[in-house]
A protein has these predicted regions:
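Acidic, glycine/polar-enriched metal-coordinating patches/loops
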Residues: 59-69, 81, 88-92, 106
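Consensus positions within tandem repeat domains that build extended binding/scaffold surfaces
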Residues: 11-14, 35-37, 65
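Structural signature of tandem-repeat unit edges
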Residues: 1-8, 17-32, 41-57, 70-81, ...
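Short loop/helix-cap segments at secondary-structure boundaries that form the rim of catalytic
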Residues: 39, 86-89
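Alpha-helical elements of the RecA-like P-loop NTPase motor core of helicases
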Residues: 35, 83-86
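A structural signal for alpha-helix termini and helix-coil/disorder junctions
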Residues: 15-16, 91
Length: 106
């Protein structure tokens, strides 16, 4: 779990996710993500984002999915924010991978 109070997630911390099995939980305070959520990796990763307002992606094209080449990552967001995430810039490019947190079974 990423500690509460973190507002900015730096580039490169999730670039290779080989074999990650535990969920990564971002706090409600997260505002920006630099780079991709996940980039390459043969293991799945579940990401839980508690932020009600979808964090803004910095440093990637608005035409590029934040998952890059990783199609095994699933992102769980607050149920009440699901629609916001599915239409937000960049997030909308990975809509099949965004789920309400109430569906998370981990």
């Amino acid at each position: 779990m990423i500690e509460e109070g973190v507002t900015d997630w730096p580039t490169g911390l999730f670039y290779t996710m080989y074999g990650v099995k535990k969920p990564v939980i971002f706090p409600e305070t997260l505002k920006t993500i630099h780079g991709y959520i996940a980039n390459q990796g043969n293991g799945y990763i579940n990401i839980i984002i508690k932020a009600i307002i979808p964090p803004v992606f910095v440093g990637i094209s608005t035409k590029q999915s934040p998952l890059y080449y990783n199609s095994t990552t699933e992102v769980y967001v607050p149920d009440e924010s699901l629609k916001l995430y599915k239409v937000a810039e960049n997030w909308k490019l990975m809509v099949k991978h965004i789920h309400p947190v109430s569906e998370y079974q981990g």
